[in-house]
Amino acid sequence: MDDVRLTFHAVAEPQPGPGWRARFERSWPAYRGWYLRDGDAARPSYADARRMLLAHMPELAPTWERLVELAGGGDLAARMLTLYDPPPVVRGCSQAVFARPEPVLVRNYDFDPDLLEGVICSSAHTGRRVIGMSDCLWGLLDGINDAGLAVSLAFGGRRETGPGFAVPLVVRYLLEICETTEQALGALARIPVQAAYNLTILDRAGAAVTARLSHDRPLSLAPAPVATNHQQHVEWPEHSTAIASVEREARLLDLLADPVATEPELVGAFLEPPLHSTAYAAGFGTLYTAVHRPAEGAVEYLWPGSRWRQSLDAFEEGSRTVRLPGAKRSKDCSHV
C-alpha cells in the first residue's frame, strides 16, 4: 500500500464565525450526501429535530441557531446540524484511563482517512473553554474542558439503531455543561442516543468510568474504564472479528493491570498492534492517538514519530501533516 498523508488543523474560534462558515462551505456537499443517503423522508422534520434538541440539550440551542444562520438558514442544514437521527456511522477506537502518575485518558481513533475532518477546535460556545477533535461540523470525537473533564467515544458494536442523537454531539454537550464524571453520567442517563456507543470519561479528581450507551437499553457502566467496540459481550461477530475488538480490549485490561508499567509504556502501546491498526482500506485504521491530561488542561495528539501538544492556556493554531505508514485511500465502507 501507499502511505497516506493527513493534515490536521488547529483552530481557535471561541464562538462560531467566519472560520466555521468556511469549513461548512467546504464540507457541506459531502455531509449533505451522507445525510440524504437514505432519502429525505428517512430524516426527521425541522420541527421534530428542533424540538428534540430543545428538550434534551437546550444549552446548545443558541449555538445551533448561530450555526444555522452561518450555514445560510436552510431547512436541510438546520436539520442535519441538530444531529438528531442522522444516518448511523460505524467507527473503531480503543480507549482507557491510566492513573500513573496522574490520571490520563488515552484513545486511538480508528476510521477511514477520507472521512476525517481533522480539525482540533478550541472553543467557548457556552462560556466554558473546550478543546476537541471536530466531527459532524460541531460535534466532538473526544476532548477536554476547563473544569478538567475529558471524554472520548468508541462505537459499541451493534447494528441496531433507533431515534436519538449522534454521539459526537453528546460528547460536545458533556464538555460544554459538565464539570465532573458524576455530572456527565447524570446527563447521559436522560439523553436519547441513536446507536450503541462507549464513552470513557475522566475528571480532574480522577473519577473514571466507561459508560455503555444504547438507544434501547438503560445506561450501564463497564467494569473498568476501558473500551473498544463491543459492550457486555460481542453482538456483531463479523465486525468484532474484523477489527479485533476483543483482542484490543484484552490488551487494554492487561496494561491496566500491570503494576509496574510506566506512563510512556502505556501510551506507547497505543502506537503498536493490536491497539494501533493499519486497516485503512477497510475504514478502520488508526488516524491519531490522543492523550488527555485533565490535571494540566492539555491534550497531546500522537502519530508514529510525531507529537502535537495543545492546552487550554497555550493553544497553538496551525497545521500539521502526518504520514500514516501503509495506509491507502479507500472508499467509504464505514456506515452501518
Task: Explain the meaning of each model-derived region.
Residues L76-V97:
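Short, glycine/charge-rich beta-strand/loop segments that flank catalytic centers
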Residues M1-D75, L83, R100-V336:
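C-terminal, well-structured catalytic/ligand-binding subdomain of enzymes
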